[in-house]
Amino acid sequence: MTNLKAVIPVAGLGMHMLPATKAIPKEMLPIVDKPMIQYIVDEIVAAGIKEILLVTHASKNAVENHFDTSYELESLLEQRVKRQLLAEVQSICPPGVIIMNVRQGEPLGLGHSILCARPAIGDNPFVVVLPDVVIDDASADPLRYNLAAMIARFNETGRSQVLAKRMPGDLSEYSVIQTKEPLDREGKVSRIVEFIEKPDQPQTLDSDIMAVGRYVLSADIWPELERTQPGAWGRIQLTDAIAELAKKQSVDAMLMTGDSYDCGKKMGYMQAFVKYGLRNLKEGAKFRKGIEKLLSE
């Protein structure tokens, strides 16, 4: 079994969520009572990973601070006997989990962001989790499915894994995957035969499958990333490096189990907020009544 480290690229500027993200990192936008990045870290930890590397930017100090210990806050909560809140704050970074930071000096793309993590990862396999795609943990147990299942399959086969989902409609803003066999049920795996970042003419691909922002990558991806030239949007794309790797060895796509929300865009963020709000143990019932009242007006 391989002990993998996870990379979370958080250096992006959150353009789709402006003006909210002008001064607040998109990863710190709340989904009810936790910032988006917390759901991502919780998923990674549930999959068994203990070392997490945040690739950050000078404007992302709030993300780094979120996972740091706030002695003043913890002391205040203890003095006021706010035990539940204190426990929640202390669980932000679980015991035994190490969260490190490295800076991406220039916005040169996701592939470049991953390369910035190489000194900390070394020439080893690793996991990449994009911070703006939240997988609903009530729709799929994170201890068993999706990232956890990808890691298990990687440990079994040694092949790189990409999580995928069906997305009928316009795929021009996404990473589109074509597989050898149809991904016709949750959890099914098939070899990737084509992988394109934000295709100009997605209708020319016989596929409605897109990447969901979860990758388990063998060490063979490093030379491909080093050779990758700027692609879509003038950026070094991880997708392009994986596509080259898939020409040389088997790279698997796994169809996601459950639901996900693209919280880097307004519609996905609103959907996630409502979904998590409705099942919030403390305020969910009131929230539901409030929404029902608004819809009836």
Curated annotation (Swiss-Prot):
Superkingdom to which the source organism belongs: Bacteria
**Keyword annotations of the record:** Lipopolysaccharide biosynthesis, Nucleotidyltransferase, Transferase
Name its GO BP terms in alphabetical order.
lipopolysaccharide biosynthetic process; UDP-alpha-D-glucose metabolic process
InterPro entries listed in its UniProt record: GalF, GalU_uridylyltTrfase_bac/arc, NTP_transferase_dom, Nucleotide-diphossugar_trans
Question: What GO molecular functions are on record for this protein?
Answer: enzyme regulator activity; UTP:glucose-1-phosphate uridylyltransferase activity
Task: Name the pathway it acts in.
Answer: Carbohydrate metabolism; nucleotide-sugar metabolism; Bacterial outer membrane biogenesis; lipopolysaccharide biosynthesis
Q: Spell out the protein name for this chain.
A: UTP--glucose-1-phosphate uridylyltransferase
Query: What's the gene?
Result: galF
Which SUPFAM superfamilies would you find in this protein's record? Answer: Nucleotide-diphospho-sugar transferases
Family per similarity comment: Belongs to the UDPGP type 2 family.
Q: Which reaction does it catalyse?
A: alpha-D-glucose 1-phosphate + UTP + H(+) = UDP-alpha-D-glucose + diphosphate
Q: What is its EC number?
A: 2.7.7.9
Record has Transferase as a keyword: yes
* Signal peptide (UniProt feature, chain positions): none
Q: List the disulfide bonds.
A: none
Source species, please?
A: Shigella flexneri
Mind telling me which Pfam families this protein's record contains? Answer: NTP_transferase
